[in-house]
């Protein structure tokens, strides 16, 4: 656990917490506002959360060489996360551009 300084740990852990809170808030917004297509954004954020968790786990175990596969998994989930976030943004744009029926 000594691989990172305390301020760097604070950044890593707060990033994971930030992703969790953001996913929860976006999901809640989708439900409360009735915009189900926003839920795609919440799901699109999950791979980025997995990526951040991989980084924290690897550093927690002092960058152990036995856990080098976590670095590969982090890279993969970062790419997947970037793609899913892009697709979610496109989906939200597409749904928002369609004329909607008036709400009662």
Swiss-Prot record:
Pfam families: DUF2499
Membrane topology qualifier: Multi-pass membrane protein
Disulfide bridge map: none
One GO location term (cellular component): plasma membrane
Keyword Chloroplast annotated: no
Transmembrane segments: 6-26, 41-61, 73-93
Keywords: Cell membrane, Membrane, Transmembrane, Transmembrane helix
Broad class of where this protein is predominantly found: membrane
Domain of life: Bacteria
The family this protein is said to belong to: Belongs to the ycf49 family.
The protein, known as: Ycf49-like protein
The species this protein was found in: Synechocystis sp. (strain ATCC 27184 / PCC 6803 / Kazusa)
Taxonomic lineage: Bacteria, Bacillati, Cyanobacteriota, Cyanophyceae, Synechococcales
